[in-house]
Amino acid sequence: MSRTDDPGVAGLRVYIVGGAVRDDLLGLPAGDRDWVVVGATPEDMARRGFIPVGGDFPVFLHPRTKEEYALARTERKSGRGYKGFTFYTGADVTLEQDLQRRDLTVNAIARTPQGELVDPLDGVADVRARVLRHVGEAFAEDPVRILRLGRFAARFGDFSIAPETMQLCRRMVEAGEADALVPERVWKEVSRGLMAQAPSRMLDVLARAGALARVMPELHDDTAVRAEIDRAAAAGLPLAGRYALLCRHTPERDALGRRLRAPVECMDQARLLPLAVDALAASATPAAQLDLIERCDALRKPERFDALLQAAAIVAPVDLSAWRARVQAVRAIDAGAIARQCAGDPARIKPALRQARLQALGGA
């Protein structure tokens, strides 16, 4: 993590902050590094060739490494929701003040380029104790932090949540802060939580805080849902499959997807999975197999169908190899050749094509 030999930051007080420091302490692979710069101005950064990319506050890309460098800042609540903040980034803002505005103590640890930790909020102790604890009462000013807490609980399955932090989340929800969350931010955190190692913990945190019913009121949440999304995580399923399993017991899954503004792929999987699970249980005959293949548009979208089968396999056993062979057998039928054989009698094309596909499935 050394920056001692980087001429781009020579003379600047720079620190690695946040997740990179936390994950290093946990012995996890290093991800993207975020840097905070103390005592500098935007003009100082521009003179060094740093590229401004921040909107609400000054953030810059290193001209060579493209890592993010943010000027140390404080923030003050000035309105409702996660956008209701006023930021101050003067050169007099200290590192400790910047760390104080962060969400959790485990994310409020800094490291110098020489490797020395700066830990005014005892985040290292909470990393060692495996505790997610809010930094201070300012946590309550940003409702996104409830979602982030759920996501971190899902990612770090052996971490507990400090009781006072959960109490604060409940007070935030009761005060209506969660109602100010916009769909894009909810989806961003929920989707990342679904891709973590224990997605059910995210649902647990949001439910205990009272936020789940506010941000996903349509969702039917029970022990079966939680068990299935955790099995999906263990199996390494992609996001669309995990989301489909999350929604499998939710009658209003389309409304939920629209509320979250979930991607089309996720909404398609959520819509098709219940059909597939039911059809797979009754697909002993070629006719039933062909009906499922056609209803799921597997001939045009075989990769999506394969992903759908993998999600269905979380619910009940599925012979993936056999189904892949069936799709391949049906796709091998030359529809053009059949159409030519039926020249002069177009009405025969559809039944002839179906019969050929059924015969292919009988031998698949």
Curated annotation (Swiss-Prot):
A single BP term in Gene Ontology: tRNA 3'-terminal CCA addition
EC number, UniProt record: 2.7.7.72
InterPro entries given in the database record: CCA_bact (IPR012006), NT_sf (IPR043519), PolA_pol_head_dom (IPR002646), PolyA_RNA-bd (IPR032828), tRNA_CCA-adding_enzyme (IPR050124)
Uppermost EC category: transferase
Pfam families: PolyA_pol (PF01743), PolyA_pol_RNAbd (PF12627)
GO molecular function, one term: CCA tRNA nucleotidyltransferase activity
Domain of life from the UniProt record: Bacteria
Cofactor names: Mg(2+)
Residue sites binding Mg(2+) per the record: D32, D34
Catalysed reactions, as listed in the record: a tRNA precursor + 2 CTP + ATP = a tRNA with a 3' CCA end + 3 diphosphate; a tRNA with a 3' CCA end + 2 CTP + ATP = a tRNA with a 3' CCACCA end + 3 diphosphate
Residue numbers binding ATP: G19, R22, R102, R148, R151
Disulfide partners: none
Keywords from the UniProt entry: ATP-binding, Magnesium, Metal-binding, Nucleotide-binding, Nucleotidyltransferase, RNA repair, RNA-binding, Transferase, tRNA processing
Positions with a binding annotation for CTP: G19, R22, R102, R148, R151
PANTHER family per UniProt: MULTIFUNCTIONAL CCA PROTEIN
Note: A single active site specifically recognizes both ATP and CTP and is responsible for their addition.
Family: Belongs to the tRNA nucleotidyltransferase/poly(A) polymerase family. Bacterial CCA-adding enzyme type 2 subfamily.
Biological role stated in the UniProt entry: Catalyzes the addition and repair of the essential 3'-terminal CCA sequence in tRNAs without using a nucleic acid template. Adds these three nucleotides in the order of C, C, and A to the tRNA nucleotide-73, using CTP and ATP as substrates and producing inorganic pyrophosphate. tRNA 3'-terminal CCA addition is required both for tRNA processing and repair. Also involved in tRNA surveillance by mediating tandem CCA addition to generate a CCACCA at the 3' terminus of unstable tRNAs. While stable tRNAs receive only 3'-terminal CCA, unstable tRNAs are marked with CCACCA and rapidly degraded.
Official protein name in the record: CCA-adding enzyme
Gene name as annotated: cca
